[in-house]
Amino acid sequence: MEKKQNLTASNPETVTIFRAEYEKFLGQEQQLLSQNERIFRLENQVSVLTEALRLARHKQFGASSEKSEEPLMEQLSFLFNEAEVFAEVSTKQEEAVVVAAHKRHKKHEYTLDNIPEGIPTKQVEHRLEGEELVCPQCGDTMTEIGKEVVRTLEIIPAQTIVREDIYYTYACKSCSENADEGCETPMVKAPKEKNIIPGSFATPEAVAHIMTQKFVMGSPLYRQEQDLNRRGIPLSRQTMSNWILRATENYLTPVYEQMHKELLRREVLHADETTLQVLHEPGKAPQSESYMWLYRTSGDTNKPIVLYEYQPGRGAKHPEAFLKGFKGYLHTDGYAGYHNLPEEITVVGCWAHARRKFDEAVRSLPKGKAKGSSASQGLTYCNLLFRMEQEIADKTAEERYEERLKQAKPVLDAIFAWANSRTAAPKSALGKALNYLKEQWPYLTNYLKDGRLELSNNRAERSIKPFVIDRKNFLFANTPKGAAGSAVMFSLIQTTMENGLDPYRYLTWLMHTANHADLTDTQVVQSLLPWNAPAELYTK
């Protein structure tokens, strides 16, 4: 050892060579570590992009249904060690019946089209006459012995007629004959009907038709203009737009405001929002996004209300202002803006959104890799919760509350423990699903607090869908005033249909009645609400 130390000490060049090689080795090791880190990042990026590509392809070419292909109890096989948690769950299979060594799938039930009773009927009789009645055998005249009735359906396009109101003037003939003696001739004229839009030739029927074509059938005003022009009626889209806005402002807005007051008195609501492009929004570019907000009642009422509200942004201040005075539960999606509402509003999360994210994670996996994966397990947990809700749907609110504590609470505890035991790349589909579940957990479990609450916010999504579909036709609103008017129109029409009314007949009745009413009187406006409409306005 002493000899080796002496050798090193006597040869400083050797020390220098050893040190240089050592530093070179360290540099290569550091470079290798950096390359490995870069490879790891790139592999993760490729994995995320591949998932996104599979998901995009599925959305474009695959089935849109989120229904699971495996029966629920087969999906639950990975939970065999927690069987006591699910002991209350029904094991019946509704979609397939196992017979011998094969499966017999449930037949699809078709709804046969038919002509309902009560439709106006036109009878056309087909009889034989003259020589047609001569018997080909003996030449005698044949007599009627029976008939066959064949029912078919005729559809007559909307008819357009001109209504002429003729107001007669009356005078006293006797006074007229004695006019020379200083007798004035009194004249009386039949009182005029008040036009719903002064100075126009609009009628409640015409305006209601334009409204329902645009907001129920999704036919933009330019298409209605073309249709009217083909029938020889030169009615411009500008005129129709003005009619809608004037009628909305004068007759529909008071009813909308009263429904807003009624909405705030309810204890369970739903909310959602979607984008809308408004071309002439002050201080904003035409390409920027504004928002249509939706607020509606839940399934605990027989007087449903659906209200839309236009706002230029998506800030939390908008739902806070609209819901001022409301105290109760609000079903929402995971948007953070709802989480900053006043404390008297309890936000209830949406399990349909959580399930959708796990469903996307499953669909993003390579073919054959889904079964048994963490994404599939998360989806199975969500399916179990929805199955439980189906089984208690017909129970009272109090019974649902008790059943959820008994059945769903243990499942929720198991889901949370399972989610905390899983890891995934944050940007992967599974990572996003797990992150959503953990972040939204306090809101996702709030539905346990009251039996009237629902597992998802699908009720709001279904109500905002008509606007989303119509938006594909009209694309944008021209002005904020027009967007606000559209919100009132959608509100009246969707609330009308939810209450079982025919929107055209209701709007016609509403404008006829409101045209002669004092809309500053709350009781008068109350009488115009959809659930107070006459029975003949309801759909058959």
Model-based region annotation:
Residues 1-201, 241, 270-271, 404:
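Short, flexible loop/hinge motifs at secondary-structure junctions
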